[in-house]
């Protein structure tokens, strides 16, 4: 079972992914939690480069895909073969929304690269944590992180369009309190997992 968390920065993805990981462990599931980019030795090196270097859009895209390819090969496929529940903090929709809708790279090209990097592995369910950009920016400011409003608006729009096009995407209103959002996540998962 592969569960992907998606959403703009400040939507609460990381918090909710960790919360679900702990919850499922307590329920007796064998669970893995990985972040993108990252999750492997190579992926963490690429993450550091992506977060600290000034990169053009193409280089950035290829590094994200390289990190993803290594994570799929080294961790996700073996975990799925062992019947683990794999939780991802970001996956393919983030790349399409950020690099495609946000930065203007060709969306179809990114989808093809995603297919190549993932070897066709797809989430059983994608939880898109949707939040108005103003609320996300306020949350980010509290963590001393800053993003461009116009850019995040484009990315959010991209995520919402992808949610209509792609299979198995559930949009969750992430503007509420942490516990309310988690209850919505459990409701969404009840169709694919005994929670």
Curated annotation (Swiss-Prot):
Residues where ATP binds: 7-14
Keyword Nucleotide-binding among UniProt keywords: yes
Protein EC: 2.7.4.9
Known role: Phosphorylation of dTMP to form dTDP in both de novo and salvage pathways of dTTP synthesis.
One record GO biological process: dUDP biosynthetic process
Pfam families on file: Thymidylate_kin
GO cellular component, one term: cytoplasm
InterPro entries: P-loop_NTPase, Thymidylate_kin-like_dom, Thymidylate_kin_CS, Thymidylate_kinase
Membership in a protein family: Belongs to the thymidylate kinase family.
Enzyme class: transferase
Keywords: ATP-binding, Kinase, Nucleotide biosynthesis, Nucleotide-binding, Transferase
Protein name listed in UniProt: Thymidylate kinase
Domain of life: Bacteria
Gene Ontology molecular-function annotations: ATP binding; dTMP kinase activity
Catalyzed chemical reaction(s): dTMP + ATP = dTDP + ADP
């Amino acid at each position: 079972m592969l569960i992907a968390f998606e959403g703009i920065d400040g939507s609460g993805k990381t918090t909710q992914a960790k919360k679900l990981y702990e919850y499922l462990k307590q329920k007796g599931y064998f669970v893995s939690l990985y972040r993108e980019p990252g999750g492997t030795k190579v992926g963490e090196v690429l993450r550091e480069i992506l977060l600290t270097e000034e990169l053009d859009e193409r280089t950035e895209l290829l590094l994200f895909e390289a990190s993803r390819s290594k994570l799929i090969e080294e961790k996700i496929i073996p975990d799925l073969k062992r019947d683990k529940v794999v939780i991802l903090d970001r996956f393919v929709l983030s790349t399409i929304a950020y690099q495609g809708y946000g930065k203007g790279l060709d969306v179809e090209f990114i989808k093809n690269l995603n297919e190549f990097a993932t070897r066709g592995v797809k989430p059983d369910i994608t939880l898109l944590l949707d939040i108005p950009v103003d609320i996300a920016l306020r949350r980010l400011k509290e963590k001393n992180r800053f993003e461009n409003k116009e850019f995040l608006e484009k990315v959010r729009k991209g995520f919402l369009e992808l949610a209509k096009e792609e299979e198995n995407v559930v949009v969750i209103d992430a503007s509420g309190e942490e516990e309310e959002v988690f209850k919505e996540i459990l409701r969404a998962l009840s169709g694919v997992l005994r929670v």
